[in-house]
Amino acid sequence: MTLRAATAFFAVGFVLHHLDHLRRGYGVVEEGVIAGRTVAAMLVAVLFTLVVTRHHTAPIAAVVVGGAVLVGVVTVRLVPPFGPPSDHLGAEGTEVWSWLAVGIELVGAVVLVLAGWRALRPTPA
């Protein structure tokens, strides 16, 4: 998968996860989660710009941003609550939509990291 296609796939997952937060309402989400999501959104915007403009740092940005989002989402959503920030998917009443949105974002982050890593490898002569 090309870096552009991987970025588009990741962006879909990122937006779906964000829409899930909007659907659930920000009153149920801790401030630390909102702050982390805001930082992630800024990084994703920079990444998107780098990829669309075919900037030479786009592959590195894909690995870094994809990896950071992957670690952040796993820590906040999948690891049992250990303190703020946490928005654990295992909580009672978690809906299928939330699982789906997070799952698509996580798969997109893995695809993004792999595409960035692949783009960093030298092409055979």
Locate predicted features:
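Membrane-interface loop-to-helix entry segments
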Residues: 33-40, 96-110
